[in-house]
Amino acid sequence: MKKPDIQQLKDIVNNSNQIVFFTGAGVSVASGIPDFRSMGGLYDEISKDGQSPEYLLSIDHLHDNKESFINFYHERLLIADKKPNIVHQWIAQLENQQKSLGVITQNIDGLHEDAGSHNIDELHGTLNRFYCINCYEEYSKSYFMTHHLKYCEKCGNVIRPDIVLYGEMLNQKTVFKALDKIQHADTLIVLGSSLVVQPAAGFVSEFKGDNLVIINRDATPYDHTASLVIHDDMTSVIEEIVNSNS
């Protein structure tokens, strides 16, 4: 990576006080969670089984066959042993230093929360929470995993993860909170997102602040509008920033 890019990123962060982070699947790769659509990712593995990923991750699957849906997310979605990496930790640290308004994420792995971030807008929900589809009793991930739950202890109906399935709308309260963050940000740092899947592109379009920074392995449609673009291994970039500040 180019040292001038690292220095420019440091300068932008040091001179900003209302940073908003927008994160995609690339942020969690170093935690052992492959991008859903990459080789070896969830979509790739499901497709090998001859199943449609979109159907298995849909509200229709839940309605059509509750037992199949339960077994699917127990076998494929639950990620008990994954830990936050240096990128999650850096984001949380800047929030704790009151340099950041928070993080908007497309990820469902809950690793921003695990790293210590508090002001998180999880656009697609989180696997850190579960609830009953009938009585809406809520269960934490730790309780859910420890007790190997499949059915609600209160009413006996199915428990589902608090994620947005295909066929469901995004939570509008979460969307409005995310948009408000971006509209008040002086710097928007995009990490590990291709910015091609909606609503990601729409959110970036709402940013009117001073610095748009994009750190992603591949090019995005917004690279030409950014103050700084780094196409490199994200973990290496953030390690360089953290080590230079220590």
Curated annotation (Swiss-Prot):
Reactions accelerated catalytically: N(6)-acetyl-L-lysyl-[protein] + NAD(+) + H2O = 2''-O-acetyl-ADP-D-ribose + nicotinamide + L-lysyl-[protein]
Pfam family, one: SIR2
Residues annotated as domain Deacetylase sirtuin-type: 1-246
Active site: 124 (proton acceptor)
PROSITE patterns in UniProt: SIRTUIN
GO molecular function terms attached to this record: histone deacetylase activity, NAD-dependent; NAD+ binding; zinc ion binding
Top-level taxonomic group: Bacteria
Xref: Gene3D superfamilies: SIR2/SIRT2 'Small Domain, TPP-binding domain
EC class: transferase
Residue positions binding Zn(2+): 132, 135, 152, 155
Subcellular location: Cytoplasm
Cofactor info, note text: Binds 1 zinc ion per subunit.
Cofactor(s) listed in the protein's UniProt record: Zn(2+)
Primary location: cytoplasm
InterPro entries xref list: DHS-like_NAD/FAD-binding_dom, NAD-dep_sirtuin_deacylases, Sirtuin, Sirtuin_cat_small_dom_sf, Sirtuin_class_U, Ssirtuin_cat_dom
EC number of the protein: 2.3.1.286
GO cellular component terms, A-Z: cytoplasm
Binding-site list for NAD(+): 25, 36-37, 106, 108-109, 124, 193-194, 216, 233
Its job: NAD-dependent protein deacetylase which modulates the activities of several enzymes which are inactive in their acetylated form.
HAMAP family assigned: Sirtuin_ClassU
The family this protein is said to belong to: Belongs to the sirtuin family. Class U subfamily.
PANTHER family: NAD-DEPENDENT PROTEIN DEACYLASE, NAD-DEPENDENT PROTEIN DEACYLASE SIRTUIN-5, MITOCHONDRIAL-RELATED
Name assigned to this protein: NAD-dependent protein deacetylase
Source organism: Staphylococcus epidermidis (strain ATCC 35984 / DSM 28319 / BCRC 17069 / CCUG 31568 / BM 3577 / RP62A)
Lineage start: Bacteria, Bacillati, Bacillota, Bacilli, Bacillales
Gene designation: cobB
